[in-house]
A protein has these predicted regions:
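Non-heme Fe(II) oxygenase metal-center motifs and adjacent flexible, charged/small-residue loops
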Residues: 2-306
Length: 306
């Protein structure tokens, strides 16, 4: 019989309070496309991660470089809640180590994603209604095969809470949530821009950092401009305007004494306008490989059967 999950499973209890006072049953988000039921935030944490409790500090505009438009919250999530959020999401979400093939110079190359990934959401042409995917305009059940390859997964409550708080603070709308887990300094993401056509012109992307501090590097695509931010736990960067079309960004590897940093989670909220966005995000963040979950005892990701 599965062990009953309580708040004790995620956060260390206080020695000054009775154990009974710490136990807070955790409900779950359910969907047929989930590999397992995903735990909801305990009520106390959900409240702490909702307005007016966040953002913790107002955002600061960074637009002093050519074509750059950022709103930097340092932090958006308070330190204690950022740590709780990191531990919770690492333990409760399904993760994947996606492999895919691309052609470079006419030669097919296999790419192994150097980080753990997962994704939830659905593009603007459709929406979830009672757990089923329907056309956004007609509300008729989608049966044209557009999502046959990867059944979309609705954003679970634990991420939906943060999505709503982000929308309230920024005035932007998001329908996708991508989560990256960098287990150590060896995990990284190379320079890239999120400028795919399915995001529309000048997309806005909210990017959260939880856990270990990592350097966030940016460089202009054509001009000799660059930026480096040391992102601490709870920080959020809102990238908007021409930032994606004119700039690249990356999280480089860390070596030496900083390589085993305890791990970092990156959450990005974005808005896909067409079904190509849904196909792309599930292909590169879930794929066809095995699913992994965090093992609290071994302190590592372990392959699980879906």
């Amino acid at each position: 019989m599965p062990e009953k999950r309580t708040l004790d499973a995620f956060f260390a209890p206080s020695a000054k309070r009775p154990r009974e006072a710490e136990a807070e049953p955790v409900s779950t988000s359910k969907h047929s496309a989930y590999p397992f039921d995903i735990a909801d935030f305990p009520a106390t944490l959900a409240k702490e991660l909702s307005p007016p409790n966040i953002p913790d500090k107002p955002g600061q505009t960074i637009d002093d470089k050519q074509d750059l438009d950022l709103l930097y919250f340092d932090p958006f999530v308070p330190k204690l809640q950022a740590r709780q959020l990191f531990e919770f999401l690492r333990a409760e979400l399904p993760f994947y180590r996606v492999q895919y093939k691309i052609k470079r110079g006419g030669i097919e190359t296999e790419i192994k994603t150097p980080r753990w990934t997962t994704v939830f959401g659905l593009d603007e042409t459709s929406r979830f209604k009672d757990g089923r995917v329907v056309d956004a305009e007609s509300e008729v059940l989608v049966a044209d095969g557009r999502y046959t390859r990867y059944p979309p997964r609705p954003i679970p409550q634990c991420l939906e809470t943060l999505r709503r708080a982000t929308e309230a603070a920024t005035g932007c709308k998001f329908n996708f949530c991508l989560v990256n887990y960098y287990a150590s300094g060896a995990d990284s993401i190379s320079y890239h821009s999120d400028d795919e056509r399915f995001l529309g012109r000048d997309p806005t992307i909210a990017s959260f950092s939880l856990g270990a501090q990592r350097d966030f590097l940016m460089k202009h695509k054509t001009a000799p401009e660059s930026l480096k931010l040391a992102l601490g736990s709870g920080a959020m960067i809102l990238m908007r305007g021409t930032t994606q079309s004119r700039w690249l960004h990356s999280i480089p590897k860390r070596t030496g004494k900083n390589s085993e940093d305890g791990g970092r989670i990156n959450i990005t909220f974005r808005r896909a306008m067409t079904k190509d966005g849904t196909e792309n995000y599930y292909n590169y963040n879930v794929g066809r490989g095995p699913m992994y979950r965090w093992d609290r005892i071994r302190r590592e990701m372990r392959q699980r059967n879906e």
